[in-house]
Amino acid sequence: MGNMMHRGKGSFTHVENTVFFDHALSLKAKGIYCQIRSLENNPEWVFTIRGFATLVKDGVDAVTAGLKELESAGYIIRARRRSENGRFLKAEEATWITLDDPAMYANVAAELKEEGYAILSDFKRDPATNVEFELENDFPSGGTDG
């Protein structure tokens, strides 16, 4: 069986393995999640779907579909504050929170609600369906093709 190796410059993004081994997510959604995580600590970057779509080849529709997939799976919470008159603030002022594991969703959403946010994400997955994995058990016994 061949080995995988990496040589790089040292700049990296930490991503929990849970998202990679979630068989319910498409590669598109996993890629979008990782790209977002790579940008999170850039204080000058303001997340908008259109702005994010300029960074990738797939375009606004594909990004929107991938984000909806991540939201419904519980890896992203989209939240927005309301103004004093009850209207939502501009889309540019929305808050997007990435989660390492969908099991965190309920607690984080509750914290956001306490802070005055409205939760806009449509989380459809039962957290009990999230599968804990062991790395050695996630691969076929004969290794991988390739």
Please name every model-derived segment.
Residues 6, 27, 62, 82, ...:
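Compositionally biased, low-complexity repeat tracts
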Residues 10, 50, 61, 103-106:
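Generic alpha-helical secondary structure signal
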Residues 9, 80-83, 89, 127, ...:
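Small/flexible residues
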Residues 11-18:
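Short amphipathic alpha-helical segments and their helix-coil junctions
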Residues 19-30, 35-93:
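Winged helix-turn-helix DNA-binding recognition segment
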Residues 1-10:
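N-terminal leader segment of winged-helix/HTH proteins
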